[in-house]
C-alpha cells in the first residue's frame, strides 16, 4: 500500500479562519496521517477534529497544551491504518498502527521538542523508552526544535551539545534521515532559518516502504513549512532480499564486496550515506548473483521438485 504522512507545526489552531484554510489544504494534500505540532489547544473534541479534517473515518489522539504553549494532534484515516495502542508523553504522541491493507504493524511518533537543553534529554529518554517498549518498525517525526548539523541552521558553524545529543539518539536507534526535496529549511522568519522539522525512520520501516521520499510544501498560515512523507510499499509477492551463504564459497567474493563498497559515493547525513551504500550493495549483489548462479529461487524450487 502507498502511504502519505503530513507533519506541520501550525502555531496555534484557535482562529476559525485559520482552521478553514488548514481544512482546505488538508483536502488538497490528501494525506493518510496528519500530525500537527504546537496546537496551543488544551482540549480537542471530535467536533474540533471534524472542523479540520472532514473525513467521516477520521480518528485521532492528542497531547493537550500547557495553557497557550505546545500541544500535539495526530489524525488518521481509519480505512488506512488501525490504532492498536497509543502513548501520550510529555513531548510526544505515539500510536502502534496496523495497516488495514496488508496488516503491517509499526510504531508512529509525533514530536514537539522543548527549547531548553536539559529538557531535550528528557525527550530522548521518552522516545527511547517508547521504542524499547513496542520494538516494531518505527517512524518518528515532528518539530524537534534542534538541528543535527551546523549547516542546518543559517549562520551556524559549530556543533553544540544539543546537536551531539540529537545525533546520538539517531545513531543509537539506527534511524535514517533522508534528503528533503523542495527546500533546505523547514522554519524561517525575517532573519533566521533552520531545519528543525523532519522525518526519521528505522531501516525495517523503510524495508516496507522502499520508495520513500520527503518533500517540503509551501509555507502558509505558519512560520513552519509543512513536510510530507510519501512511500510505496513492497509489491505483494515480491521476495525479500536475503544473503545467501553459498556466496561465501565463491573465490574472491569478499574482495568484490569490498571494492563495491569503497566505490559508492553519496552526499548527506551519515545515516543516509550508510543506507544508500547498503541499497547500492544490495543491487550489485542481486546482479552478480544472477550472473554467477542464475535465479536462486528457481534453482531451489527445482531441487525440491
Positions of predicted regions on the chain:
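A shared catalytic/ligand-binding motif for oxyanion handling
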Residues: 1-305
Amino acid at each position: 500500500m502507498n502511504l502519505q504522512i503530513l507533519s506541520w507545526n501550525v502555531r496555534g489552531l484557535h482562529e476559525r479562519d485559520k482552521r478553514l484554510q488548514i481544512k482546505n489544504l488538508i483536502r488538497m494534500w490528501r494525506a493518510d496521517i496528519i500530525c500537527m505540532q504546537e496546537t496551543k489547544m488544551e482540549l480537542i473534541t471530535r467536533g474540533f477534529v471534524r472542523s479540520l479534517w472532514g473525513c467521516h473515518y477520521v480518528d485521532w489522539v492528542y497531547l493537550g497544551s500547557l495553557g497557550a504553549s505546545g500541544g500535539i494532534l495526530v489524525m488518521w484515516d481509519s480505512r488506512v491504518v488501525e490504532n492498536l495502542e497509543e502513548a501520550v508523553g510529555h513531548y510526544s504522541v505515539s500510536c502502534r498502527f496496523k495497516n488495514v491493507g496488508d496488516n503491517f504493524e509499526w510504531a508512529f511518533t509525533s514530536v514537539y521538542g522543548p527549547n531548553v537543553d536539559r529538557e531535550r534529554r528528557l525527550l530522548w529518554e521518552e522516545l527511547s523508552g517508547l521504542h524499547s517498549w513496542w520494538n516494531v518498525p518505527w517512524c518518528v517525526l515532528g518539530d524537534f526544535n534542534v538541528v543535527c548539523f551546523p549547516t542546518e541552521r543559517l549562520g551556524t558553524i559549530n556543533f553544540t551539545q544539543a546537536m551531539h545529543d540529537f545525533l546520538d539518539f539517531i545513531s543509537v536507534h539506527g534511524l535514517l534521515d533522508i534528503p528533503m526535496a523542495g527546500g533546505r529549511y523547514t522554519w524561517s522568519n525575517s532573519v533566521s532559518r533552520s531545519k528543525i522539522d523532519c522525518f526519521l525512520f528505522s531501516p525495517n520501516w523503510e524495508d516496507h516502504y522502499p520508495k520513500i521520499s520527503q518533500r517540503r510544501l509551501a509555507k502558509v498560515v505558519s512560520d513552519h513549512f509543512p513536510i510530507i512523507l510519501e512511500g510505496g510499499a513492497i509489491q505483494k509477492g515480491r521476495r525479500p532480499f536475503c544473503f545467501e551463504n553459498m556466496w561465501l564459497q565463491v573465490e574472491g567474493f569478499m574482495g568484490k564486496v569490498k571494492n563495491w563498497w569503497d566505490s559508492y559515493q553519496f552526499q548527506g547525513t551519515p545515516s543516509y550515506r550508510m543506507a544508500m551504500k547498503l541499497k547500492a550493495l544490495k543491487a550489485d549483489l542481486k546482479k552478480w548473483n544472477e550472473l554467477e548462479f542464475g535465479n536462486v529461487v528457481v534453482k531451489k524450487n527445482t531441487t525440491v521438485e
